[in-house]
């Protein structure tokens, strides 16, 4: 069984001292268990994403992530997960133009939100070594979606976190994954395991829409008036709060069981704006 099972985030707000003295030593020690490092990548038309933060120097963020990847010898994954960016030809052409320098810097893994773009084959033609992930925001839950995404050209599929407690559906998805391999379209399957959000959260899509359309003049979601009806208060109002979190328990047996159910990678959350 593959040991490289974790996809880890690079927090864009890490200080240089922390990166050098703490983060890189950690990555060196555990690199045999880490598949890749993903980071929020801000290039047109993706000026914002589901992480929801605003930065003054997007180029510096990219350069910092590339530095960490090079120093740790762990592949870098650029994340473009804003599903509210219009999926038209103009934006596809623009993204290919803007991503080219990053690809030429050695980045070979991306998360992309639009199946139409991947289906066009234009991205693969421009970047033949690119490994393409879908975004968890597309809420993939069905075996048929696995096959469709593999046929479209995705190499790696993030499942909806709610499947964590649906063993029967995971077994069906494992069969779909095997079928993709039979078709000559093998895919890796990933599960986000520690975001602490409720399974079936009724406002999660709206939270991510808020983040993905936020500007520097807007407060973060949890500082906005509308958050009064969000999970910012649920831990106090609902005694069952912890039991509803779609988190994988810390016990090793549970993680091994997920692998046996077809999960290749455990994604650890990288949301910049965590409610504290």
Predicted regions and their residues:
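Active-site pocket-lining/capping segments in soluble small-molecule metabolic enzymes
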Residues: 2-145, 154-274
């Amino acid at each position: 069984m593959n040991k490289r099972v974790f996809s880890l985030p690079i927090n864009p707000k890490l200080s240089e001292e922390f990166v050098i003295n703490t983060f890189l030593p950690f990555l060196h020690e555990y690199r045999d268990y880490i598949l890749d490092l993903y980071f929020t990548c801000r290039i047109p038309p993706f000026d914002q994403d589901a992480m929801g933060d605003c930065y003054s120097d997007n180029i510096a963020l990219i350069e910092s992530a590339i530095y960490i990847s090079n120093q740790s010898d762990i592949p870098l994954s650029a994340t473009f997960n804003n599903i509210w960016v219009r999926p038209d030809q103009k934006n596809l052409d623009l993204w290919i133009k803007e991503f080219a320098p990053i690809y030429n810097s050695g980045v070979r893994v991306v998360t992309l939100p639009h199946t139409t773009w991947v289906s066009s084959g234009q991205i693969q033609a421009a970047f033949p070594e690119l490994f393409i992930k879908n975004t968890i925001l597309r809420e993939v839950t069905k075996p048929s979606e696995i096959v469709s995404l593999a046929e479209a050209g995705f190499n790696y599929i993030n499942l909806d976190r709610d499947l964590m407690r649906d063993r029967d559906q995971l077994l069906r998805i494992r069969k779909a994954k095997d079928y993709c391999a039979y078709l000559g379209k093998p895919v890796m399957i990933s599960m986000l395991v520690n975001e602490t959000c409720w399974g079936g959260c009724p406002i999660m899509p709206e939270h991510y829409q808020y983040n993905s359309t936020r500007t520097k003049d807007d407060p973060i979601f949890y500082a906005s008036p509308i958050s009064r009806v969000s999970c910012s208060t649920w831990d106090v109002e609902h005694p069952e709060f912890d039991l509803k979190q779609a988190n994988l328990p810390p016990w090793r047996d549970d993680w091994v069981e997920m692998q046996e159910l077809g999960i290749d990678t455990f994604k650890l959350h990288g949301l910049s704006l965590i409610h504290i």
